[in-house]
A protein has these predicted regions:
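A ligand-binding cleft/hinge motif common to bilobed small-molecule-binding domains
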Residues: 85-89, 208-227, 276
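Immediate post-signal peptide segment of exported/extracytoplasmic ligand-binding proteins
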Residues: 20-28, 43-49, 147-149
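Short, low-complexity disordered leader/linker segments with a strong preference
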Residues: 1-26, 321
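Periplasmic-binding protein-like
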Residues: 124, 182-185, 191-192, 225-248
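An extracytoplasmic/periplasmic, membrane-proximal ligand-sensing/linker region
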Residues: 176-179, 280-321
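Extracytoplasmic ligand-binding site segments that recognize negatively charged/polar headgroups
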Residues: 28-39, 58-62, 74-207
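Mature extracytoplasmic/periplasmic domains
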Residues: 237, 247-300
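A bilobed periplasmic-binding-protein/Venus flytrap-type ligand-binding module shared by bacterial periplasmic
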Residues: 127-134, 170, 240-252, 271-272
Length: 321
């Protein structure tokens, strides 16, 4: 029996090595920030498979614009976005293929869509980020940020550039309507730019409070000693799975599937947590930030949010000007 098991194990290992050995060439991946994570994932995948990774890194808006420009001549195999609703839009447009990735049974419930086309390998949440020199203490709920004491101190990322903020605005409007966001806009809320520019405005003290700031940026900056703090308001926030997807036009489909498998590996998920993102697997926890179960959430109707997300993002920018 022992000899049989040894032979069986050897066969399994050889099969896995053979499958890996069959991979060659390259895979092209479009990924949002953080850039350090993208580089580490690419290096890890190449080390594991021998497949070269060509990358394009940008905001969700920049990635979508590039995909549109390349529509007649597809380059990308795998696309990762910071917006689940934009991933749903790609599926709706018939641009994705279905696949069952390795470790699918360990993925957080709901972070793989019903058609197995969107794979939430990580996630971020948005919260209230504040400069502790300008505002020493803060715990206000979203609606309370419209109070006169915060006039001229509010900023929000551009939801037409930030996928995370776009989904927050859609989720908040779908759940609570426009009154709170309009009141914050009337209180002088400004839009400095995408996530990085918006956080910079708070870090430098140009404004004191960032509404709907993406959390991993805050945790990373705090670890570097910046005078920042973050909390998730009691009214709830949007936790945004970051969908990795295989394009139906992928020139390197087998390599694309292998890359998706790698994203859910122990190694890749550890890299995710080191980048201050929430891991896509429920069996892996963070030690450097709040875990999923610690974050109050808005009940998200993603289909309803998809229907209003683009219009809501444009409207938010309009009322903040």
């Amino acid at each position: 029996m022992k000899r049989f098991l040894a032979i069986l194990l050897a066969c399994v290992l050889c099969t896995g090595l053979a499958a890996s050995a069959e991979l060659s060439g390259k895979v092209t991946v479009y990924m949002p920030s953080p850039s350090g994570l993208a580089d580490k994932l690419a290096a890890g995948f190449t080390a594991a498979t021998g497949v070269a990774v060509e990358q394009f890194q940008g905001t969700t808006g920049e990635i979508l614009a590039r995909l549109e420009a390349e529509e007649a001549n597809t380059v990308a195999d795998v696309v990762i976005l910071a917006s689940w609703s934009d991933g749903l839009s790609m599926k709706q447009g018939g641009k994705l293929v279905s696949y069952t990735p390795a470790n699918a049974d360990k993925v957080v419930e709901g972070w793989i869509d019903a058609d197995s086309m969107l794979f939430g390998y990580s996630a971020s949440a948005v919260g209230v980020i504040y400069n502790t020199i300008v505002v020493p203490e803060l715990s206000a709920d979203w609606s309370e940020l419209a109070d006169a004491q915060y006039a001229g101190q509010l900023a929000i990322p551009d939801p037409e550039k930030s996928g995370s903020c776009k989904d927050f605005v859609a989720g908040y409007v779908n759940a609570y309507g426009w009154d709170d966001l309009q009141a914050m806009a009337d209180n002088g809320m400004v839009v400095p730019g995408a996530n990085k520019a918006a956080l910079e405005a708070v870090t430098t003290g140009e404004v004191g409070i960032l509404v709907a700031g993406v959390d991993y940026n805050a945790y990373s900056s705090m670890a570097k000693g910046e005078p920042l703090s973050i909390y998730y308001p009691a009214g709830g926030t949007v936790v945004n799975p970051r969908p990795a997807m295989i394009l139906s036009t992928a020139p390197n489909a087998d390599n694309a599937k292998a890359f998706i498998d790698y994203l859910f590996s122990d190694e890749a998920q550890q890299l995710v947590t080191e980048a201050y993102l929430l891991p896509g697997r429920s069996d892996i926890k963070c030690e450097n930030r709040s875990n999923l179960e610690d974050i109050p959430q808005i009940a998200c109707d993603w289909d309803a949010m998809l229907a209003i997300s683009t219009e809501s993002a444009a409207q938010l920018n309009a009322i903040c000007k």
